[in-house]
UniProtKB/Swiss-Prot annotation:
Keyword entries, A-Z: Aminoacyl-tRNA synthetase, ATP-binding, Cytoplasm, Ligase, Nucleotide-binding, Protein biosynthesis
Signal peptide (from-to): none
Source species of the chain: Lacticaseibacillus casei (strain BL23)
Main localization of the protein described in the UniProt heading: cytoplasm
Name recorded for this polypeptide: Glycine--tRNA ligase beta subunit
Length: 689
């Protein structure tokens, strides 16, 4: 016989972003609880609204399976005295297992007799186990928690009711002053309390009280309603998945509606309209058949269609107030020039330990100019980059960005276009924030990419200079994300970026330009270098590069980021080659024997004592002439060709000869070869089978 078990947590309204992950956590911890308690079960239905998290477990076993087991105790010589009487050890062992010494049997293991008890453990019933679900409820974690009443207990929101039904029977449990029962709550305004006769009644009973508990069904209903309204008005709707998920977790009985706003507000930049509707009001914006935005929106209320006209009017009033403010800010911002706003950045702090935003922009301009030369930008791109770097933060002091912080960069691009800046300059202003997340879109333009790198690297150097370095999970200034973004941009364009050398060069350039702001850029250069290489590791791991190859290519503290990425890709591309193992073994042998060796002599070919020495040295010299500054496929093939000469060399040559002059000469020759191999890192760490 199997059962259905319903467990529901009834709460005050949860934040929308918490609902879905909390339901998944509730499910996963329940599955773990059932597994730990050896209760078999079938499918588990997951239900959630802003006011509840619930699970319905199907085909739940009536009880645990009965188990028989033999429990090993002490050796016989310890369990019985010389007269065969049971000792305290035997009596205590049997009592601990709920049995008596009369139940003891002996088994011989490797010539030694041991005490054993054969136990038949009767499985507990589901009804006896399920009260333990209270611990699952209490174990749920949330990004924010609160207390209520006089209790010290913390949860995402106060718990008002619990339902715990095994078929038609209540499974008792109590949390604070809330006893689990069979009564759940309908819609806050449209429904009534519902007394469930059976766990299986849950979905239908709540639907009758204006609550759709299935998230997928509720989301589909919202989608269908929106599409119907759009079809009725011949609109195109961007049914944004994140917004749909958020709205779905804000309602229990959704009813979509269309609203309008004055056409005059369409003169406001589209990004502002979208932000006002989508981010601030959770509306879906509308476009006509040609893709042009129209003065309308679709919202979703938590209720039925009663008095919908009043709901629409209220929503229109709220949106109009927002758009009126936006229109005012937009007009006011255009009364000032970009130069005016740039000057106002002198009063805006980037960080109180570092500088103003104006000074940060000046440092970034120096860094961007230096990077432009290294990356080979054209004269036109350099000019556009310099202009963009001199103004790119100006929109931070605009009223529009003050009201809508998420539009920084976007409004900068728009205002730059209005002011007659070149398209490349305006685009770079918007793109310098990218990527805005670990896997976010990268800047499309070269100018925007270099500005983004320069801005982020200035932030990294500046924060490290004042010892504000991320530790553990603490990263309040998102420096890991910025460094990760730099590595991704470098990887996309395969630009040289030797972090250790670059820090010194930038510090010197800033000093020469008088733009250091008294920051000690030398204080944590090695820390920043290691920090950037760690981000390169993350990028490679995200590309599914083998961990041993990642470790091998990132071993050099002075390595160029692009070189690290290229080396990893090349080694990974050849990892399944039949000759990869002998090549890595040969190259790794050179690195191992030269490790920690420091030789300050020139190679003297006259001291070579066998043909293999000359052959390997000549091949090394010839290879070095063709080697690129950073690893290439041709470089790998050249090193691969040296595998046989290396093996022949070690077969015929004792590197650590007793004669110091011979030893030093051989090490000097091998160190030249090792320097070439190290372009690919420490390949001796590559695991080959």
């Amino acid at each position: 016989m199997t059962h259905q078990y319903l467990i529901e947590i009834g709460l005050e309204d949860m934040p929308a972003h918490v609902v879905t992950p909390s339901l998944q956590q509730f499910h996963d911890k329940t599955v773990a609880f059932l597994k730990e308690n050896h209760l078999d079960h079938g499918a588990i239905d997951q239900y959630a609204t802003p006011r509840r998290l619930a699970l319905l477990i199907h085909d739940l076993a009536d009880k645990q399976a009965d188990v028989e087991e033999d429990v090993k105790g002490p050796a016989k010589k310890i369990a019985q005295d010389a007269d065969g009487n049971w000792t305290k050890a035997a009596i205590g062992f049997s009592r601990g297992q709920g049995m008596t010494p009369d139940d003891i049997v002996f088994k011989t293991i490797k010539g030694v007799d041991y005490v054993y008890l054969h136990k038949a453990i009767k499985g507990k019933t589901a009804a006896a186990i399920l009260p333990g679900m209270l611990d699952v409820i209490k174990s749920l974690t949330f990004p924010t928690r609160m207390k209520w009443g006089a209790y010290d207990f913390e949860y995402i929101r106060p718990i008002h009711w619990l339902v715990s039904l095994l078929d038609d029977a209540i499974v008792p449990m109590k949390l604070l002053d809330v006893d689990a029962g069979r009564t759940t709550q309908g819609h806050r305004f449209l429904g009534r309390p519902v007394t469930l006769g059976n766990a299986a009644d849950y979905v239908a009973a709540l639907k009758a009280q204006f609550v759709i508990v299935e998230p997928a069904a509720r989301k589909q209903l919202i989608s269908d309603q929106i599409h119907q309204i759009a079809a009725d008005h011949q609109w195109q709707i961007d049914l944004d998945a994140d917004l749909l998920e958020e709205v779905n977790n804000l309602v229990e009985w959704p009813t979509a509606f269309a609203g309008n706003f004055d056409e005059k507000y369409l003169k406001i930049p589209e990004a502002v309209l979208i932000t006002s509707m989508k981010d601030n009001q959770r509306y879906f914006y509308a476009r006509d058949a040609s893709g042009k935005m129209v003065n309308a929106f679709i919202g979703v209320r938590n209720g039925n269609a009663d008095h919908l006209a009043n709901v629409i009017a209220g929503n229109e009033k709220v949106l109009t107030a927002r758009l009126e403010d936006a229109a005012f800010f937009y007009a006011e911002d255009q009364k000032r020039s970009i130069a005016d706003d740039v000057d106002r950045l002198k009063a805006v702090s980037f960080h109180d330990k570092i500088s103003s935003m104006y000074d940060k922009m000046a440092r970034t301009r120096v860094i961007a100019d230096l990077l432009a030369d290294r990356f080979g930008l054209s004269a036109t791109d350099k000019a556009d980059l310099d202009r963009a770097a001199s103004i790119y933060k100006f929109d931070l002091v605009t009223s529009m960005v003050g009201e809508f912080p998420e539009l920084q960069g976007i409004m900068g691009e728009h205002y730059a276009q209005l002011a007659g800046e070149k398209p490349a300059v305006a685009q770079a202003i918007a793109e310098h924030y990218e990527p805005i997340s670990a896997d976010g879109a990268l800047p499309e333009s070269l100018v925007g990419t270099v500005l983004a790198i320069a801005d982020k690297f200035d932030s990294l150097m500046s924060f490290f200079a004042v010892d504000l370095i991320p530790s553990g999970s603490n990263d309040p200034y998102a420096l890991r994300r910025q460094a990760y973004g730099i590595v991704r941009m470098i990887a996309k364009h395969d630009w040289p970026f030797a972090v250790a050398e670059l820090q010194t060069t930038i510090a010197d350039a800033l000093k020469a330009a008088g733009k250091t702001n008294n920051l000690d850029f030398a204080a944590h250069q090695q820390d920043l270098n290691a920090f950037m290489i760690d981000r390169a590791k993350q990028v490679l791991q995200g590309q599914k590069i083998r961990h041993d190859i990642v470790d091998a290519v990132t071993v050099r503290a002075d390595a160029d980021l692009a070189g690290i990425l290229d080396a990893a890709k090349i080694l990974s591309a050849h990892a399944d080659d039949t000759d990869f193992k002998p090549v890595m073994e040969a190259l790794g042998r050179v690195l191992r024997i030269t490790k920690k060796q420091q030789v300050k002599v020139d190679v003297d070919t006259a001291k070579f004592e066998n043909p293999s020495e000359g052959q390997l040295y000549d091949a090394t010299v010839a290879t070095a002439k063709k080697f690129d500054d950073e690893p290439t496929e041709a470089d790998y093939q050249a090193l691969k060709a040296l595998a046989d000469p290396i093996n022949a060399y070690f077969d015929a040559t004792m590197v650590m000869a007793d004669d110091q002059a011979i030893r030093q000469n051989r090490l000097a020759a091998l160190l030249q070869l090792a320097a070439l191999i190290k372009q690919f890192g420490d390949v001796s760490q590559v695991i080959v089978k």
